[in-house]
């Protein structure tokens, strides 16, 4: 027995001498470094760097690992023209790149976690890359070159939508967005608003500086608090009066503010209809 034990100890000693580091303590290879992030536009890279805390004040290269954890980026008025590279920010929830020179939104296509997107004052025409960003709740696209908004039809979580100062004529793509509470379409080329009464959750609706004459599609919007219709082609306020009369429970009429300056209202609208609306609690600003 002692001979066997001694033999075993000798074998163990030889193994230790040959391989002094136990297998369970063997060194592992370090993880491969994260690929360097690449931006086509140095102005965009500078904006992103400000939100990478460890590298905001240095010149170490940004890596893809740095980008994947970013939730917010803001780069207002920096002369940004190209968004390439931003597609690596897969967990981005809020992005504000207003007042730049952006045209192409394709790098945003896969950023499906964005909830707040501000791109006002750019040169954007094509909204199709936004069609699958279903998490969007706030979208600001005022003062661009947008003509068609069909791509927004699928953004069913949108609560606030700003599209003023564009070239929009057809609003049919947004009249069935179930969560929409604020809609701004000032300074466009809108002549008709069919289906707008489908947006039953609207609190604020702004159509200033368009070419709207018929207000009958507004009937059926019980939650409106602010209705802006300045500088259109409205002559008759009958539909508004009917809306207020039907509000027997006084749920919205006493809280409704209507802005009508700059419309060719008839004498009847200015006197009888104004008076009737005011008696029902509607505040007229003309």
Which stretches of residues belong to each language-model region?
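Short hydrophobic transmembrane-like helices used for membrane targeting/insertion
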Residues: 2, 10-14, 18, 102, ...
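N-terminal capping/linker segments that flank leucine-rich repeat
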Residues: 3-9, 13-94, 107, 112, ...
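Leucine-rich repeat
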Residues: 67, 88-92, 108-114, 130-136, ...
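Conserved hydrophobic beta-strand positions in leucine-rich repeat
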Residues: 71-73, 95-97, 117-119, 139-141, ...
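Canonical position 11/12 of the leucine-rich repeat
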Residues: 78-81, 101-103, 123-125, 145-147, ...
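Canonical leucine-rich repeat
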Residues: 83-86, 105-108, 127-130, 149-152, ...
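A generic tandem-repeat structural signature
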Residues: 98-99, 103-147, 155, 160-165
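Eukaryotic tandem repeat interaction scaffolds
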Residues: 159-220
